[in-house]
Design a protein with these regions (language model features):
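ATP-dependent adenylation/nucleotidyltransferase module used to activate substrates
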Residues: 1-200, 244
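ATP/NTP-dependent adenylation/nucleotidyl-transfer catalytic domains that generate, transfer
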Residues: 2-3, 70, 75-78, 91-108, ...
Length: 293
């Protein structure tokens, strides 16, 4: 395995799928996750769980080696106190509804991708110099992000990468890899299904180790252990915030049940209930667009 990549791994569905994509394409991957004070920091635990699962399943197959994934969580201590966003601790409530609605702009974290990309660029350039070969900067940004998050748009990514090239010697050894830039979450999930098949991975086990929810819910759960009833706390995804709506829509289109557990303020809910709720949001959004034409 010769190709190198540094991946921004949030623990969400998009970057987790891109990790599978890179492995299936023969990359050796260094994953960087960022703790910037996000409310939904369960995503960092999911990232760790996924990397652990993938490393346990690395092997030779058809003369290709799926190498162990390197992973590091970078803590940006104190950054949340400087940021105005519903996604960070101390910010406003995370809005609910369709992911294309204007109120979703409250979930923008100022300059987030620029902050992350600067660190990722530095790591990629260092790897390229150490190994004497080119290194990709991989990000799972996609078309569904463009209307809400300006730092996910092609023009920003191009300008940011140009600034990196201008500011560093040897930058020609690094290239930008954003295969989902023109696709949506459904396209990403389809690619994830393909990669799981290629890598002989269990799709449900992989995607159970991802978090897309901006409003995860911690609930007490009880299970039997022999004759005893054991109490535990587990994280559930919400199904009303925009990020969750977009994820559920992708699973509906793919015709698969989402393996993550969903809940609301009243407790756990079934996948059928989640599908029905999200379908109604999507229908209402389309009806509103038609009315406004």
């Amino acid at each position: 395995m010769n190709k190198q990549a540094v991946l921004s791994l949030s623990g969400g569905m998009d970057s987790s799928t891109l990790l599978l994509h890179l492995l299936a394409d023969g990359y050796e991957v260094t994953c960087l996750s960022f703790d910037y004070g996000q409310k939904h920091n369960i995503e960092l635990q999911r990232a760790k769980e996924l990397v652990k699962y993938l490393n346990a399943h690395s092997r030779y197959e058809d003369e290709q080696y799926y190498a162990k994934v390197k992973h590091q969580v970078i803590t940006l201590k104190g950054l949340d106190k400087l940021l105005n966003s519903a996604l960070v601790k101390g910010g406003d409530d995370v809005p609910e509804g369709h992911y294309a609605e204007d109120n979703m702009k409250a979930t923008v974290v100022p300059n987030r991708n620029k902050i992350f990309s600067s660190i990722i660029q530095a790591a990629a350039l260092s790897i390229a110099e150490q190994k004497g070969k080119s290194c990709a900067i991989a990000m799972g940004i996609h078309a569904g992000d463009h209307s809400v998050y300006p730092d996910c748009r092609q023009e920003f990514r191009d300008a940011d990468f140009e600034a990196f090239k201008l500011g560093n010697w040897g930058s020609e050894k690094v290239y930008l890899y954003t295969p989902y830039l023109l696709g949506d979450k459904f396209d990403i999930l389809k690619d994830g299904e393909r990669c799981c098949t290629f890598l002989h991975l269990n799709f449900d086990k992989v995607y159970a180790k991802t978090n897309t929810s901006y409003k995860p819910i911690k609930l007490k759960v009880y299970y039997n252990e022999g004759e005893d009833t054991v109490e535990s706390e587990e994280w559930f995804s919400d199904y009303k915030s925009a990020s969750s709506v977009e994820r559920v829509e992708a699973f509906i289109k793919l015709g698969r049940k989402d393996p993550v557990q969903y809940a609301d303020e009243f407790g756990p809910v079934t996948w059928e209930y989640v599908k029905e709720f999200v379908s109604s949001i999507l229908e209402n959004y389309e009806d509103a667009k038609t009315t406004n034409i």
